[in-house]
A protein has these predicted regions:
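An interfacial alpha-helical scaffold signature
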Residues: 1-243
Length: 243
């Protein structure tokens, strides 16, 4: 039987696994396509899985991706979790056990590092004030070179502003760790996508700081979501599996 994998969790978070060595149903959590989820014990860990068929493989769409995330979020309420990428499958019981066994030290270290932690997600949208290319009385070649120089200058200015904003956010929220990406939107604005790793106990304090940030940084449009499982902070090591 093939298994679809959602995440790795701590075995001791699920009392029903204390007396069993075989997969046990995880009550109250529905998997992809309405399938029953199971707790698959593997040493000190548990892998949350559901049965997977060839027909299921043809139905892996955006709705399925959302269901995948919902299962991980439900498990996160019960345990530290290490999310698997959407679409991760294992051919059979032995394949799943081998993967966990070969990555045991890596998985355990991640669980220890992320225990009691959560991810908060900030989107910060600001005007991109870098000037556009001005067309003067220049030849085609001169315009091209001028465009290249101005593009490079805009990119440097954009990166400098992104770093300044990122530092401001870091000082304001004081996360344990952070992952930041910056891009220019189609509307010409600059979007900072910020993931902050924080202690579970400080979620309310973080939310209060966000409320203050909205008042202090009126030139920015901000959006907060979370707490989430720490997707951005799981140190990846390719597990051996059949996908």
């Amino acid at each position: 039987m093939s298994w679809y994998a959602y995440c790795i969790a701590e075995r001791n978070a699920f009392p029903e696994l204390c007396r069993h060595r075989r997969p046990m149903p995880l009550e109250g959590v529905t998997g992809l396509f309405g399938n029953q989820t199971f707790l698959f014990p593997a040493s000190d860990l548990a892998v949350i899985v559901s049965e997977h068929t060839p027909e299921d493989a043809a139905r892996m769409d955006q709705s399925a991706a959302k269901d995948h995330a919902n299962v991980i979020a439900d498990c996160f309420k019960l345990s530290t979790v290490l999310p698997f990428r959407f679409g991760t499958t294992f051919a059979d019981d032995d394949s799943l056990r081998r993967s966990v066994r070969s990555n045991q030290r890596h998985f355990t270290a991640n669980v220890e590092r992320l225990r009691g932690k959560a991810e908060m997600h900030l989107k910060v949208l600001v005007d991109d004030t870098c000037p556009g290319t001005s067309e003067r009385d220049l030849t085609v070649g001169q315009l091209y070179l001028t465009s290249l120089r101005e593009s490079a200058a805009r990119q440097r200015e954009r990166q400098s502003r992104a770093r300044a904003l990122s530092l401001q956010m870091h000082r304001m929220f004081l996360p344990i760790a952070e992952e930041i990406t910056c891009k220019r939107t189609d509307s010409g604005k600059m979007l900072l996508d910020i993931a902050h790793l924080i202690d579970n106990k400080t979620v309310e304090r973080y939310q209060n700081k966000y409320t203050s940030a909205l008042q202090e940084m009126k030139e920015c449009r901000m959006q907060l979501s979370g707490p989430w499982p720490p997707y951005h902070f799981v140190q990846r090591q390719a597990p051996q599996h059949n996908a």
